[in-house]
Amino acid sequence: MAYPGHPGAGGGYYPGGYGGAPGGPAFPGQTQDPLYGYFAAVAGQDGQIDADELQRCLTQSGIAGGYKPFNLETCRLMVSMLDRDMSGTMGFNEFKELWAVLNGWRQHFISFDTDRSGTVDPQELQKALTTMGFRLSPQAVNSIAKRYSTNGKITFDDYIACCVKLRALTDSFRRRDTAQQGVVNFPYDDFIQCVMSV
C-alpha cells in the first residue's frame, strides 16, 4: 500500500531545490552545504536546533516568501515530524530534509492559491491533499478544514501545519501498519503518544 507524504509513494511532498544560502564550515564529519549558513546561524555547539531556533532560521532564510513567517507552534510540529530520537531538536541532515519538504509544499500551495491571496479555501485544500496522495473521506477533509481555516480560508502557515501533521501521523500509522493493509491495532497509550507527539 502506498502512503502519501513519502517520495516515490505518489504524494506528500516533492523533491525540490535547496535555494541559495550562505555556506560555512561544516560540523565535524559534514561537508559544506549551501543551507549550512542558515542552520549554523542559530544552532548551538551541539549542532542541533529546537523550535525557537528553527523559527528564527526559517524567518531569516525567507523560505515563506511573501507569506507571513511560521509561528512557533508550526515550528514545533516541524521539529516533531523529523525528531526520530525524541530529543526535541533536529540536526543539520533533518533540517535539509525539512527544507526540501517545505519547498515542495510551498510550491504546491502557490499552485492552489490561484488568486494570490495568501490563502486557500477548503475545496482547494481538498484538491491539494488529493494531489499529494492523501485519500481521505469528505468527513476527514471537513474536520481538517475546520481545524486549519479561519473564516473559511487557510493561510500558508496553517497549510504547512496541516501538511506537517498529516505527514507525521501518516508516518506513525505506517510504522504500525506492518501488513500495509491500512488498518492498525495498537494500545491506547501508544495512540496517545502518537497523537500528542505531533
UniProtKB/Swiss-Prot annotation:
Q: Which residues form the EF-hand domain?
A: 29-64, 70-103, 100-135, 134-169
Which PROSITE patterns does the UniProt record give? EF_HAND_1 (PS00018), EF_HAND_2 (PS50222)
Q: Where in the cell is it found?
A: Cytoplasm; Sarcoplasmic reticulum membrane
Q: Which GO terms describe its molecular function?
A: calcium channel regulator activity; calcium ion binding; DNA-binding transcription factor binding; identical protein binding; protease binding; protein heterodimerization activity; protein sequestering activity; signaling receptor binding
Domain of life of the native organism: Eukaryota
Q: Does the keyword Repeat apply?
A: yes
Pfam family membership, one: EF-hand_8
User: Which residues are listed for Ca(2+) 2 binding in this entry?
Assistant: 113, 115, 117, 119, 124
Job description of the protein: Calcium-binding protein that modulates excitation-contraction coupling in the heart. Contributes to calcium homeostasis in the heart sarcoplasmic reticulum. Modulates the activity of RYR2 calcium channels.
> Which miscellaneous remark does the UniProt record hold?
This protein is encoded by an amplified gene in multidrug-resistant cells. This protein has been shown to bind calcium with high affinity.
| Name the UniProt record assigns to this protein | Sorcin
| Organism placement in taxonomy | Eukaryota, Metazoa, Chordata, Craniata, Vertebrata
